[in-house]
Each structure stands twice: as C-alpha cells, then as structure tokens.
Amino acid sequence: MVLVASNEMESYFGDLEKRADDCYILVSKARKAGFDPALEPEIPRAKDLAERVEAQVGPPGIAPRIREVAKNNGRESTALILAKELAGELRSEGIEVALEQAVRTSLSIITEGVLVAPTEGVVRVSTMVNQNNTKCAAIYYAGPIRAAGGTAKALSVLIADVVRRELSLDSYIPTPAEIERYKEE
C-alpha cells in the first residue's frame, strides 16, 4: 500500500519518528543507570503489524513474509497461511516447537500484535496423548485470552487444527466421560 502525504505531513511524521527515537535513547540511558530493574525499554518499536508480531512472538525475520502474504489476504487468511508455512518450516526443530510458534505467531496476527493473548493468554501449546495412544495438539489458556475476544479465541483453535494437520498429528479424541459431560452441559 502506497501512502501519499504532503511535504508538511512527511516532515511532521519524520519529526515524530525522531522524537520517539530520542525518547528511546533517553529511556535506555536512564535504565542503564540502574534505577529500574530492566535495562532496556520493554516495548519494542514497530512501524506496522508485521514488525509488532515479530517483536511480540517471532520468529525472527518473519515480518517481511507477513507483509507479503497480507498484501493479497485478510488478517485471518494471512494468519492461517503463515501458520501452515511455519509448521512446515519449523518441523525440523521439533513438533512442539513448530506447533507453539505457529499458533502464537498466527494468534498475534489476528490480534494485530497489540494484545497479550498470544503471550499471556496462551500459557502453552504442546502435544498430548489421546486415550488410544495417538498424539494430538493441546492449547492451554489463561485469563488474558479473554482480551482477544471470542473470534480470536475460536480462531486459535482453528489455527491449532490447521497446524496439527500440517504436522501429521491426530485430532483430539474425547473420553466417554467428557462426551457425557458436554451432553449434560
């Protein structure tokens, strides 16, 4: 997407960037003086969705690919396409690494890299063993997932399903007791 702005607007945005850079330099100097437990500013600078996602959950170097896919797709489709790609690319690092990274990155795309849902709302993404000894995907949620909203929560399950298929994991098989409980509820 090409943005057109007047020279005055370009100058204004350039000035904002410079002032923000100056603030980060000042904060870094203050932090290094030892008056704060953290030595660096906690919030990384990011110019767009792709940079926010990469800074929030990674993996390093994913921002250009997010931009490329997002040019021709909506946010949800972009998340699903990248989930599948990441699962395939990271498979060699281990099924659980690929599963977790793909789910977190895709959820961050859906939540625009501004909510804590991908980092704090998803406690863990791993595999678990079904009652028939096959492996399936498991997502463990915490309270901050609520901030993502119902659509993002539901899409996180869809994303995990797309990733588990890419990683050749079986689907979850509920126990008879779980089935009965759901019928009752």
What is each residue range found by the language model?
Residues 1-185:
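Extended, Lys/Arg-rich, non-catalytic nucleic-acid recognition/anchoring regions
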